[in-house]
Amino acid sequence: MSYKNCIINGVKEGKITDEQAKKQFEMLDELKTYYLEKKGLSQTEAERVAAKQTYDQTAIDAAEKLRYTILQKNKINEILNVFKTYRNINGEVDYANAYRALMAHDNFSNLPNIERIVDIERGKAHRLMANLLDQMKYKMGGRQTKLQKANLKLMVRELMGETTGNKNAKQLADAWKKTAEHLRKRFNYFGGKILSRENWGLPQIHDTLLVRQVSKEDWIDYILPKLDIDKMINERSGLPFNDKTIREALSEVYENISTEGMATFKPGTNSFGRALHNRRVDHRFLAFKSADDWMEYQTRFGSPDPFKTMMEHINGMSRDIAMLKILGPNPDATHTWAIGMIKKQTKIDAALEAQGKFKRKKLVKYRNEEDRSNSIIENINNLYAFHKGTLHKPIDGFFGRTFAALRQLLTSAQLGGAAVMAITDFHWSRITSKFNGLPTYKANKNAVKFLAEGIKKDKALSRTAIRSGLIAEHWSTVAGVQARYLNEVDAPFWSKRISDFVLRGSGLSHITQSGKWAYGMSVMGTLADESGKVFSKLDQNLQKQLQKYGIGEKEWDIIRKTKLYDASIDEDTIAKGKVVLLRPDDIHARADLDDATREFLTTRLLNYITNETNFAVPTSSAKGRITLAGSAQPGTFKGEIINSVLMYKNFPITLGMTHLNRGFQQVGLTGKAKYLVPMIIGGTLMGALAYEIKQVAAGKKPTPPEKMGTKYWLNAMVYGGGLGIFGDFLFSDQNRYGGSFEKTLAGPVASFWGDAIKLTFGNVKQLMSGEKTNAGKELAAFIQRYTPGSNLWYTRLVVERIIMDTLEKLLNPNFTSDTRQNINKLRSRTGQEYWWSPGEITPN
């Protein structure tokens, strides 16, 4: 009986579906044609070989589907166990909060979650390419030197199988190959399906807008001559493409890119396209003939920067790996199931609540269980959309990009002094170290070393941090540090380069990165120092924290037997025994442990380090963003209003969700006081220091001790909490920029438009009504307030006195009297004098 008859009988007997039969018929015909036309086999032999290959491929597909089904089922059982064992702050079973804990950090469980796993996977990838990151990291303003660009081109040639003879380019290419292969294996380990391909090289970044500008045929005609068809495999049959099938395949690729995946959307389903475990096959599909072909395509339809392409690949893969690890091979299906389970349990609890048989402790007395659960479900759905990336996409692209660019420019004009506020990180790092039973000085001492290394050519400590699995945020992104103050995810690259220039130039980027690396290495160094001790002999606070993250006596006994890493092995400038670390990834490399144990212990330890680092250097979180902004997207009126209101307010919100939350979780009033009182006092003192430094940088003398009253210390407390601009209202009805409380609360974007309208239409209105205008003064103030880089803390005063004051003298006829009035106001309000008075070319 022929194989076709077997397929027909299979359908009749109900063993396979019509859809499965159709796929097998198509594969059988394609294989038969290939062996007849390309291999010259006889009709009988071609049918036999095609039948066998179709059968084998069908069996492989069935095995893969079975693996996927088992992994998906196991993941659902795992999450169901989390639902049953999780306890909220009141010690109650709580399905909704249990599932939310898998999306973002939860202070009551410390479960590995998508947000933290993304960071962990990025760190693992960066670890394998420390030297590449060191050589190719962006300079100030997202700039790349001519040498970097030349070396990147040589590296691309090596990746595409060309021999350049450049040893360094070969080493960089090998580092990227190792990193990309690591990501592929991690993706597959958690249920993905990415086949290995020799000389794969690099993924492609497709700019949807650029691809849409040409027709499908024009795009295919452009890319087809650049592709190495022999290296491209038809995923369905496993055979090389012919002239017909390659155009059909490229047609699908075009539709996928131009519609952002919507071409495969089926109405009535919860998602579109392939399940995540299959989706990553696409970026390996296109195989270019040469490095020149790849670079020409990227220049025309993507990104011509290979380094950016690599970093975006790492970020995207890390996100997808995290989704697979936490939610299984089909996250959409898992999410739908989980929400269904939460709703089911909510209905049961709500019915019991109505009968008086169920009562939950809650802050809002008259809120029933169904209302509470629905609120959390809404939050969860938004978190899931955030992790998938759908919340980052502007609804109206032009509107969204315009306002994103404006926020970047405002950042470059207004955050030049934020580095001064970042000195409070030393305080947060100290109290986090103490809470975790670590030496309180160690992280801050390391941070100073990293800061000192920043002005040296040798970056040995930085490379060591990256090799230890700590993320190289400062080295791999442009304007990445602004996440501490903005909710910005994407913006036009030119605007990000401007803000990056200021953020790096001010030192904020380096201070933030140094603090994170320093704390992470402090933890690993302490664990190395303590590795000779059994669990019961560890510091009580360290024991307590490790147990919270799922590391007890049994786990510690395995972890502490891991071979310690001495950084002198890789860095000649580090003395032997000077930097010794217990690195989580070295646990993963142990041959004496099974896969599950290695993965479990490595994840738990990295989750501990990564999460506590975000306490040591408070950084914005997905939970914080979603709690405040909800489902608001860029490119909508609602989204842009919310982004404006929240601009620069991320840091205090983060403090509230980390340290303040942790303080209130401590047992009893004594426990709460032990955490919160030192936190507030230390934060206030650091806030006062930051405030006085900024006063001196603005040309003012420090505040006289006799003027340091209640208002002063309240202002210092507000400064320490990252809301310095609101502290101004303790002394005046305007902030330091002349804005009202309402304008400050509305955010910088609203203030910008308000000032722009006042400068233009406001002055025209005054002129037409015969009122006196202050157009010159307002224009000078507008230029000073909104010029990128004008408020860098170490150049601001020179710019103000020599350039801005001179400009205002020309534009404002009342400059002298206005200046005298401002000096008198300052003296009356705070008792301060200027050491470099406004309007003077030289200091007093």
Where are the predicted features?
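Small-residue-rich, membrane-active alpha-helical segments
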Residues: 419-490, 494, 639-843
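Non-transmembrane, interaction-prone alpha-helical and coil segments associated with secretion
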Residues: 1-638, 816, 820-844
